[in-house]
A protein has these predicted regions:
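Extracytoplasmic/periplasmic ligand-binding sensor regions of membrane-associated signaling proteins
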Residues: 114-118, 124-207
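Amphipathic coiled-coil signal-relay and dimerization helices
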Residues: 81-83, 130-137, 234-240
């Protein structure tokens, strides 16, 4: 069986789109001329590229809105000053009125962030063990300054990258929510260092449910449409179907044939796309 796939590349992410091509009925027909086959393939390629562009735009918009939430907090002078107070005072001063006032300022900003309702939770943290979330939980959250919370923080690779710029946003592929231990919830994260007067004092992150990706990377406009995304390191970011296709033969600017482990042949289009 031959199928159509669109592989769109960016500096950070590879997104693979595929759909079973109805035009293969014509390819297998002795009545179809070579000219007709070529026209059908071009038509299907155009349709798939249009659908891929629509999906990529929706994904980019989703990440951009997450970025707006991050920037809104990081550009809030009161919020950043309060986080700096928490960072400066630390665990030993946790019971002071100054600490409590700073924490209340952070809570008010998190709970009243206009974009809060769009996402699973928005968090702020410092690496010495402070954590605060926009999502109120009565049970299941790790306790501030506890050994358990500090252990989680220091085990998360995306919080410990040494080569990250102070203004850089990092998109983290789907993972189990590390802060909520009552049950396993899969999320994906956009995070950024929190910088106050040129000094990094913590992190701000936006978490969204991984199930949202199925809505973003799906389409009802094309029967059999499926999508898979990989990050810059080739690790799976999202998959809506089992994919064993070997894309090594794919080339820019032309539609090529690739096969999976079952011997099924796919038509592949490889393109660049902007991301964030």
């Amino acid at each position: 069986m031959r199928k159509l796939t669109c592989m769109r590349m960016s500096a950070k992410m590879t997104i693979l789109f595929s759909v079973i091509a109805a035009c293969m009925i014509a390819v297998n027909s002795v009545l179809a001329t070579l000219s007709e086959i070529r026209n059908i393939l071009l038509y299907e390629e155009d349709n798939l590229n249009a659908m891929a562009s629509k999906i990529v735009a929706a994904f980019e918009q989703n990440i951009t809105v997450m970025g707006y939430a991050l920037d809104g907090l990081k550009q809030d002078n009161d919020f950043m000053a309060a986080l700096n107070t928490i960072y400066t005072l630390g665990e030993d001063m946790e019971t002071t009125s100054e600490y409590h006032q700073a924490q209340n300022t952070l809570s008010a900003a998190l709970f009243h962030e206009p974009l809060n309702d769009y996402f699973y939770r928005i968090n702020v943290l410092t690496m010495d063990g402070f954590y605060l979330s926009s999502r109120y939980e009565t049970i299941g959250l790790l306790e501030n300054y506890s050994d358990e919370l500090r252990t989680v923080m220091h085990r998360l690779p995306y919080l410990n990258e040494r080569n990250r710029g102070l203004s850089q946003k990092t998109l983290v592929r789907p993972h189990i929510d590390p802060w909520f231990v009552a049950r396993r919830i899969s999320i994906y994260t956009l995070m950024s260092p929190a910088v106050y007067h040129g000094k990094q004092i913590g992190f701000v992150e936006v978490n969204a449910l991984s199930t949202d990706l199925f809505d973003i990377f799906s389409s009802n406009d094309m029967a059999g449409f499926r999508a898979t995304a990989y990050d810059a390191d080739g690790r799976l970011f999202h998959r809506s179907f089992d994919d064993t296709i070997d894309y090594s033969a794919a080339e820019y600017g032309s539609m090529t044939e690739c096969s999976d482990k079952n011997g099924d042949t796919y038509y592949v289009v490889k393109e660049h796309c902007s991301w964030l």
